[in-house]
């Protein structure tokens, strides 16, 4: 059964170009602007960056009116509940397992 919202689907918004730490002005973080999913599916959100000396990825969840919440972090693949993080030198992805309507939020990555 597909989830319904005002847009007819659950949209996971992503904040673009978020950086935890910028070593130089040319360093950037890239994410897609939106990802759609259905209840029970697995959704994958990608994050690429150009920070040559980055050693940690951070994935955050943000609901309007609330402080961002750290979901998962590290310099190697890891899992925290329904959230899995993949890790490579210049990229990471966040997999959300068994997507629920309550997962509709802003997700963003940062590098350190």
Curated annotation (Swiss-Prot):
Known function: V region of the variable domain of T cell receptor (TR) alpha chain that participates in the antigen recognition. Alpha-beta T cell receptors are antigen specific receptors which are essential to the immune response and are present on the cell surface of T lymphocytes. Recognize peptide-major histocompatibility (MH) (pMH) complexes that are displayed by antigen presenting cells (APC), a prerequisite for efficient T cell adaptive immunity against pathogens.
Localization: Cell membrane
Protein name: T cell receptor alpha variable 2
GO cellular component: immunoglobulin complex; T cell receptor complex
GO biological processes: adaptive immune response; immune response
Keyword Disulfide bond: yes
Listed InterPro entries: Ig-like_dom (IPR007110), Ig-like_dom_sf (IPR036179), Ig-like_fold (IPR013783), Ig_V-set (IPR013106), TCR_variable_region (IPR051287)
Keywords for this protein: Adaptive immunity, Cell membrane, Disulfide bond, Glycoprotein, Immunity, Immunoglobulin domain, Membrane, Receptor, Signal, T cell receptor
Residue ranges annotated for the Ig-like domain, each copy included: 26-112
Residues listed as glycosylation sites in the UniProt record: 48, 84
